Amino acid sequence: MDEASCRFPEWVSSKIIDYYAEQNIKALFDWQIDVLNEARQFEDQHLIFSAPTSAGKSIVAELLSWKVASTGRKVLFVLPYISVAREKLHQIQRCWRRDDISVCGFIGPQASNPNEWLGAVCTIEKAASLTNRALSEDWFEEIGMIVVDEMHMVFDSSRGAHIEHMLSKVLLWNQSALEKVRIIGMSATIPELYRIGKWLDGAKVFEARFRPIVLQNHIVIGSELRKSGDNKVLREFSEDPLILLTEESFRRNSQTLVMISSKLDAEKTALNIASRFHEINKTDSSLLEILKERANGLLFIKHGLERNGCKDRNVMSTLAWGVAYHHAGLTMEERECIELGFREKNIVILVATSTLASGVNLPAERVLIKAQPRGPSALTSLNYRQMVGRAGRTGHATRGETYLLIKKCDRDAVLKIIETPIDQGVLTRKRDAERTNLSRFILEGICTGLTTTRSQIHDLCKLLLFNSENLQLSDIAIEMLLRNSFISQDENDDQLSPTQLGRAAIASSLPPEASLAIFEDLNSASRAIALDTELHMLYLVTPINVSVWQECDWHHLFSIFSKLPSDHKRIAKLVGVSEKFILDQLQGRRNDKLLQIHIRFFSALALFDLISEMSIYEVSHKYRIPRGCLQTLQSQSATYAAMIVAFCLRLGWTYLKALLDGFATRLLFGVRSELSELVAIEGIDGQRARILHERGVTCLSHLSACDSSKLAHFLTLAVPYSSSNSNDGLGEWLFGEPRMRVDVAARTLKERARKVLIRRVQELGISVELPKFEENEENIQESCDSGLPDSCEGMEDELEEKENIVKMEEMTKSVTEMSLTDNTISFKSEDDLFKKEIKVEEDEVFIKKEIDEDEEEIVEETVIECLETSLLKLKASTDEVFLRRLSQTFSPIGRSRSILNNSLLEDSFDRPVPRSSIPILNFITPKRESPTPYFEDSFDRPIPGSLPISSSRRKSVLTNIANLDSSRRESINSNASDNNSFDVFVTPPTKSAKEEKRRIAVKHPRVGNIIYSPLTSSPVIKHPKLEINHFYLKDVCHDHNAWNLWTKSSTSTSSCSIRVSDDYTGIAIRTDAGNTFIPLLETFGGEPSPASKYFESFSKCIIPLNTRLEFLKTLAVTVEMYISSMEDAFLIFEKFGIKIFRLKVVRIAAYLNNVIDVEQEENSNFLPILMDRYSILDPEIRKTCSSSLHKAAVEVYSLKPIFEKMCCSGASLQLEMESCQTVLNIFYSGIVFDQALCNSFIYKIRKQIENLEENIWRLAYGKFNIHSSNEVANVLFYRLGLIYPETSGCKPKLRHLPTNKLILEQMNTQHPIVGKILEYRQIQHTLTQCLMPLAKFIGRIHCWFEMCTSTGRILTSVPNLQNVPKRISSDGMSARQLFIANSENLLIGADYKQLELRVLAHLSNDSNLVNLITSDRDLFEELSIQWNFPRDAVKQLCYGLIYGMGAKSLSELTRMSIEDAEKMLKAFFAMFPGVRSYINETKEKVCKEEPISTIIGRRTIIKASGIGEERARIERVAVNYTIQGSASEIFKTAIVDIESKIKEFGAQIVLTIHDEVLVECPEIHVAAASESIENCMQNALSHLLRVPMRVSMKTGRSWADLK
């Protein structure tokens, strides 16, 4: 290297320098340093620089752009070709992500939100479109730099206009912008370099001559070899110089590129070279020796081509000799295989068309150029320099040689071309209409708002590079745009504005002239479109000017046309295709006007076969189109389809847009429409989509409105059972995504569908913004009070207005047909037990509340009340809840479901339990005509949806209810304060005199079954009670006297309740001194809500924040504290530093009493449900809540009463409350976390991931998205042709084959890439799901815990430490090394040995199993010897049994045959018959709906609903409940005892994971503390157990070092 190298500038980040060092770039050249220094010195100027190929231009632009991106401004990289853009995207992403700078690609159909990236890599057209978008959407000022690679493309006759127009708009923007956009342009061959610099506002121009490897250029004229620029003949060839030069290259093992002008010539040349090598091999075996070195690589390439369906004999025959050809006639997959083979140096000679020189980065030591001075691909000066630049690239070759082969007759013409300066070559080249036609450029300027007058347009045109050519044409272009209604002009002034057609043209990236043709095409089609097949719609999205048919074989096309079905021929006639024209073509008669229509139709036929999932090779053979050209047609049509859809959308052609929407994706991927909408949602593959489709979830609206529990159930049907799912509650429920809970997966899918759905609806102009409910809360109240029809009037108008735009039925799954003429409203319950007809006036649509309250009916009152409550809750709900409740609130009249039975009441009442155990309390309503509503003897039949007293409460039951006379009815209200509570679900009484007169009547009493308490074994019967509410919220922080009085009174209280407000501004608290709200902000300006009879108006807080906090901290230590859930306790500590030491958790109590189901999404906000159930507060109070302050106060009021109503004495409740306090103390303690080591791990893992990526791509013969399961499946099963496991349970013919861990582990021996993908996924998962979330923690991690789980086990949640891996990679890194003890302390790890198995032994009382466990021998080892199976397989069986594993699952997990797995199962149950008996007994209880219980008596009833797999799953849940539940009770007892015993040693529990406890203890007390911990764990509930517990004790400095 003849130029000294220098280190990087000091302003470059060390992370970026490290990246380049890994790429073997450890220093910069002098010229690069000079450019960087000048660029930094003149930051306000644009920069244009030129340097030879391989001199290092890209790194200069990358460093400058990185500097801009690091300041938060966006950078655009503009590259000419998709292949080089993809390569640049991956490289920039790998580099910049080290500095946490996001980079995305605008290359294919994908797009990205501008808020999600700082760097964008674009093709030329995408960059032009992106800048238009930025200007239109007013975020252009966020762009700081535009880097144009291959700047010479600005002179290109077809695409250069895009660059010129884009940069001209930037120049105009910069004239008035405060923060300018900087332009960086570079290329090895920039014509008129200084002219470009002058054009770009006097940009700094830099031209370097340095090239690391000096080229040796040669010219071969005829058979004579000369050095370029020298007439001396160096050598004369006796045969074809090209063949001899390639043979010479092959013998010296030197890779060679041969550049040919045409595809046909490239194939012919490659075949000639291969034939030559074959002939030589007959007499000289030296070539064969060279090939032997590459035999494996060439064989691998051959297999790769075959797996991609390549049947081209020419490709295979040339490949056998290390020769290949590369042109656009090959498919993309074939080209990628060949490119990879050349990069890996397995292919020695590559013959390619000249487009490869600029489109693909494939350097070589020697480049041969076969000159063609004439024809469509004639050699140019610029093209020549691009091709010779491929020789001698740094890092790929040690020398560079070029040979230009010229026929003697073409000598003068070719020499003239290569000796012509590129500047002159550009100036003499003819420019096409795209360059001179300014209509598109001017229209873009007007649509983006850059120009609004003719003078501004002239100013913009002056900024063009070729302004002298264009200025005179600008007025002509403006007139054309005006004439064709693309723009309009104000009559009073010169203002120009875009029309709808103009905006549509720009939005769809269509030139104005093309827009007119497309407008006419679509307009005529919309009047007569055939919908019996997709062919006509596909024809409309097929490009008008199709150029993939090189030469049409009309004989063959006529044969195809004559065999078309009748519906296709009808469409052909509709679009203008005729048999007569084809016959005319056969006879040589031309008609150019109709030619394009016919070519377009046959192209549509080919595309129709492609989206019907016919292979590209079959379609290519059927229509005789080169497969590469067919792929080009497919890609162009996908792009064109997206443009057409955007065009229709902008024009407001909603129906046509709806018909054509989706074709872009289908054309791109070649799929049928059946599942396209569901598969478009991330996380859904073909298997999941088919299950959802079969269950009625056929579109996004169904998915978003589907009940979460149902959706979770569907996922369990779609995903094969795995034993790991039951251990921690996690599974691979979403395709290609990390393991998660099934309910989380269901909610995730709903959320994704909801977002897409709402975005689509909003795009149609229909507002679904929730704040409107919040802003008009009073109006909602009033409309609910006066009747719902008034509140819906506006909505009906809006729907009527939008009738011609969109169908709302599919969006909401609710707004369906409404009959406004029926004068009868019919209510039906689900089981159709009761019916009630209520007469209403003809103009009424919904149930109304009568003005005369004396004649109100309880059913109306209840419904209206529920509607009001639902609407009030609606304003604070998510959009998802909005969609669901909109559907349920405005249900159509006359449906088969009752309003009382739909989900309006789901927010107020628990999920019903089996009807067999539910006593029903029926509300009876007098006829509307009755003048005596309270004492009428004649009553209608009970209304449906009678409100049940749920047996899930397990507390009270209603027995022998007889008809009550008026006095008895009055006594119910008068006894509302009686201590003998009698729970009746009626509307709570209010202070209104009229409301006091209301009565209830009960008819046809039913006697309910006696229900046993979950905490005791005796039946519980209580009397109903209506609690009188005394609620008032007062402000004690506005005055010192009020504060002192309240604190003094509260200090003497024995208990209190607290609740964090939703906006975290403070805490609502209830003590004996009353209800109040304590703001915990430094400044609190008061609550603007007006005072009412329930809420005092809050004014500015004058009590110091420290005073407020100190009192609350003191109170939390001294009194018993009732809280809603553990999350509240965690929040109170994190937000305000308040610790609670005497805990009562309402959610735990509700769960123990089976009032809520922890698996149900609806129970996440359970307090309103419980408040309604136990009549804690008048709903009127909750309805008047106008802020989060009020809501918190209302909820805190209910905590203690709810807890006391639910709780009976019992060991289970006591244990849960004690363990909750212990877990809370663990949260307070936290565990020490080594953040520095974590960051070090992240850095190392990212390097490993990059290396793995390169290895995987190399093994796959091309790059692909490793994160995409679809692309992984495509590579494994199609590109590489691996065999899908037969035991996977999935049909190999499905489009999207699963590639989960289980499948890949079964395929691991087929190919090395499988193991690499598994390793990549494991490391990537550790990085993204473990290390990166943990990296933000400093000091100690205070982990949240989930106590309310279906099995009772304790789970970690925020952050989730449940699955911190023991080992990250093979070099010994472990994530558990990050969790350490403080200095002078050690960690003690105590882990139960076979806890679940020991519990099973106790519960089953199987003597053999009890004896084995009691003997303290290695159970698994002994069983392994007895059964002659591996120990690991035996262990899997024993634990799998607990989780309900069958023979098939066991065989998949242990990789044994199903027969062997069945033998193991039979051997296990034969040896331990008591286990089988216990499992059968538990299943029998489920069938009889009898309670099942844990060791200390926690009971529940699980109903065996469903058949087949669903029933088996429920039975497994029941068995799991008893075993896991009992295990959790042992573990909770142990940690409670441990906490009390280790205090004397100064030790504390810092973490619990599964059955393991981590204790941090001073090193001097480790031995004593370990002994105490072991005793506590071994003796936990030992008096109830038949088998002993055994514990593994370990100590160490970190979690990973425990020994």
Curated annotation (Swiss-Prot):
PROSITE patterns noted in UniProt: DNA_POLYMERASE_A, HELICASE_ATP_BIND_1, HELICASE_CTER
UniProt xrefs under InterPro entries: DEAD/DEAH_box_helicase_dom (IPR011545), DNA-dir_DNA_pol_A_CS (IPR019760), DNA-dir_DNA_pol_A_palm_dom (IPR001098), DNA/RNA_pol_sf (IPR043502), DNA_polymerase_A (IPR002298), Helicase_ATP-bd (IPR014001), Helicase_C-like (IPR001650), HTH_61 (IPR046931)
This protein's UniProt keywords: ATP-binding, DNA damage, DNA repair, DNA-directed DNA polymerase, Nucleotide-binding, Nucleotidyltransferase, Nucleus, Transferase
GO biological process, one term: base-excision repair, gap-filling
Keyword Transport: no
Compartment list: Nucleus
UniProt-listed Pfam families: DEAD, DNA_pol_A, Helicase_C, HTH_61, POLQ_helical
Catalyzed reactions per annotation: DNA(n) + a 2'-deoxyribonucleoside 5'-triphosphate = DNA(n+1) + diphosphate
Motif (DEAH box): 149-152
Residue ranges annotated for the Helicase C-terminal domain, each copy included: 283-434
Domain (Helicase ATP-binding) ranges: 38-208
EC class (word): transferase
Cellular component, GO annotation: nucleus
Molecular-function annotations in GO: ATP binding; DNA binding; DNA-directed DNA polymerase activity
EC number, as in UniProt: 2.7.7.7
Cleavable signal peptide: none
Disruption phenotype: RNAi-mediated knockdown results in defective DNA damage-induced checkpoint activation as indicated by an increased number of apoptotic corpses and enlarged nuclei in the mitotic zone of the germline in response to DNA interstrand cross-linking agents such as nitrogen mustard.
Positions of ATP binding: A51, P52, T53, S54, A55, G56, K57, S58
Family: Belongs to the DNA polymerase type-A family.
Task performed by this protein: DNA polymerase that promotes microhomology-mediated end-joining (MMEJ), an alternative non-homologous end-joining (NHEJ) machinery triggered in response to double-strand breaks in DNA. MMEJ is an error-prone repair pathway that produces deletions of sequences from the strand being repaired and promotes genomic rearrangements, such as telomere fusions. Required to prevent extensive loss of sequences near G-quadruplex (G4) DNA sites, which are prone to cause genome alterations, by generating deletions.
The protein's name: DNA polymerase theta
Organism encoding this protein: Caenorhabditis elegans
